[in-house]
Amino acid sequence: MEDFVRQCFNPMIVELAEKAMKEYGEDLKIETNKFAAICTHLEVCFMYSDFHFINERGESIIVESGDPNALLKHRFEIIEGRDRTMAWTVVNSICNTTGAEKPKFLPDLYDYKENRFIEIGVTRREVHIYYLEKANKIKSEKTHIHIFSFTGEEMATRADYTLDEESRARIKTRLFTIRQEMASRGLWDSFRQSERGEETIEERFEITGTMRRLADQSLPPNFSSLENFRAYVDGFEPNGYIEGKLSQMSKEVNARIEPFLKTTPRPLRLPDGPPCSQRSKFLLMDALKLSIEDPSHEGEGIPLYDAIKCMRTFFGWKEPNVVKPHEKGINPNYLLAWKQVLAELQDIENEEKIPKTKNMKKTSQLKWALGENMAPEKVDFDDCKDVSDLKQYDSDEPELRSLASWIQSEFNKACELTDSSWIELDEIGEDVAPIEHIASMRRNYFTAEVSHCRATEYIMKGVYINTALLNASCAAMDDFQLIPMISKCRTKEGRRKTNLYGFIIKGRSHLRNDTDVVNFVSMEFSLTDPRLEPHKWEKYCVLEIGDMLLRSAIGQVSRPMFLYVRTNGTSKIKMKWGMEMRRCLLQSLQQIESMIEAESSVKEKDMTKEFFENKSETWPIGESPKGVEEGSIGKVCRTLLAKSVFNSLYASPQLEGFSAESRKLLLIVQALRDNLEPGTFDLGGLYEAIEECLINDPWVLLNASWFNSFLTHALR
């Protein structure tokens, strides 16, 4: 790698990178990937600034060659690449002359045209994740962030990319070339995997002074210093030590081991109460899409442009009215919010140029729906510790809910095939090893089985919505931004298609911690009449907003079109996981792989081809009251994927607890089926731990009912 860096980069850049590594006490012979990363970052900073000048009229211009005597000033001041002292001197001087706020961390550039510092990032990972890490580290709205990736993606604060398209394309092309060059020398994989997240200030925080003395004083006996204790903890092997202690204790441990027989286990007790309601962040089987095929309009790919184009495909709008009110909400406000969206979209269409983003007017209905000014005022604890009756809020116990049939229907629907493909077959280069060949063959077979699955649509929809909401939450903290809910797919004929499910309006989003909540209002199109299963839609206000003509066996029929509106909320950490929903594909592929591996080890040859191509064979899919359900290998793939996707969509503490505790009972039952004569103690306590997670969550209740079917059939 070191040789490659010296060949690939300008000697001046290499020299600066060597200096930087020396300054931080790093050895470039060992940290070769870091050496390459520093050179790449330096080169991007220089390319960013190259050819950009400000003329005597204060206009930003691009000059690649020309009159050396022209009165031109460099548009960007380069801070990156200078030694720390010099760099801070430059920053201080800029702050003094321009009045800019002094940044906490050294930025990379200063833009004299926009009067702002710029932090440049080059990442081998997802641009969104790296952007968030940068934003979390800098914690300043004044410093502009611009991230490039080696795959040609980029992300910048408020989607303001500073430079013209051509200058940015030069940078992306260079990064792509570096990647290709590395790959051809077999260096890329190691380089890609070596990227660490942004170091937070804590990692480099040396404990000194009083805190250090306190740390040294609070060590367990027999440890002289914090370093000693750390070294001991890092090298501690717990097992032998704990076993020794347990054998000394066994006289005092009073656990009677009871045999676990077929008659021992009882079914789980599911709660009684009103039926459970829908709690996903967006509609699933009930969603309706307004779509455009082969999009080629101006601004294609910009969400707002796409949304307006999709809205224009529908002509059946009518005066909206509430058909299913939200019991606790102010329903006229939801109605007004939808009317406001329609009116503001109409305003945009009347403008000459459609903007890239749309911030909604802060009307009373939106303030109410987004909970503006509703949070109780925070008071410093020191100011109120003398208050005699200081106590936490009384929070009500959650109301118990019973299992409703709709969640099983949702799951069945998620396993079905749609008539569109939601993921592309990844184009990866030629396989160079037999194991790679088998892996890519498995991936291709699996992709073919799940690419049209509705659960895959939910993945892409979830990734899009969470990415868009997280971007808007970082870039437009104070604005009520309108975010279209969009997905993209290909039709059977291979034509591209852009779909609009509805809109989200984001509330204020000053998200400092991972768990800070951003409120949003979702408005989603549907043809489902909410009056058929009102319990499912408890959290929604549903409007009737139009009539849609549908083709049917008897010709065209008109069906009312509904809008499902609700207030909801999410957090940075939930959005981060939402953005990574593609992992569900990987998880289910790994489960299928373990089935293939088991089959292959019995037959002593790779069974991938036979596994996917033998259409006559059926495989167990799951338990139902009727017994073990079986289906084709494709159905198994789609069912496993749907389970993984629902675990993500309905993630909750109840699910975490139920999964962890029910697994223990499952292992005991499996041991009994394998004639291993298992014994248990405190089985009642285990049932209690499982059943305390069965409260009101639809997905957990469905899993518990499946678990009961499994118990019934497993112990016959």
From Swiss-Prot:
Gene Ontology CC terms, in alphabetical order: host cell cytoplasm; host cell nucleus
InterPro entries associated with the record: INFV_PA, PA/PA-X, PA/PA-X_sf
Positions contributing to Mn(2+) 1 binding: H41, D108, E119, I120
Motif Nuclear localization signal 1 (NLS1) positions after renumbering to this chain: 124-139
Tree of life domain: Viruses
Disulfide bonds: none
Motif Nuclear localization signal 2 (NLS2): positions: 184-247
Keyword annotations: Cap snatching, Endonuclease, Eukaryotic host gene expression shutoff by virus, Eukaryotic host transcription shutoff by virus, Host cytoplasm, Host gene expression shutoff by virus, Host nucleus, Host-virus interaction, Hydrolase, Inhibition of host RNA polymerase II by virus, Manganese, Metal-binding, Nuclease, Phosphoprotein
GO BP of this protein: cap snatching; DNA-templated transcription; symbiont-mediated suppression of host gene expression; symbiont-mediated suppression of host mRNA transcription via inhibition of RNA polymerase II activity; viral RNA genome replication; viral translational frameshifting
Pfam families linked: Flu_PA
E.C. code: 3.1.-.-
Localization per record: Host cytoplasm; Host nucleus
Binding-site list for Mn(2+) 2: E80, D108
GO molecular function: endonuclease activity; metal ion binding; RNA binding
PTM comment, free text: Phosphorylated on serines and threonines by host kinases, including human casein kinase II.
Complex and partners: Influenza RNA polymerase is composed of three subunits: PB1, PB2 and PA. Interacts (via C-terminus) with PB1 (via N-terminus).
Similarity remark: Belongs to the influenza viruses PA family.
Note: South Carolina isolate has been sequenced from formalid fixed-lung tissues of a 21-year-old male which died in 1918 at Ft. Jackson, SC. Brevig Mission isolate has been sequenced from lung tissues of an Inuit woman buried in the permafrost in a gravesite near Brevig Mission, Alaska. This sample was recovered by John Hultin, retired pathologist.
Record protein name field: Polymerase acidic protein
Lineage: Viruses, Riboviria, Orthornavirae, Negarnaviricota, Polyploviricotina
Gene name in the database record: PA
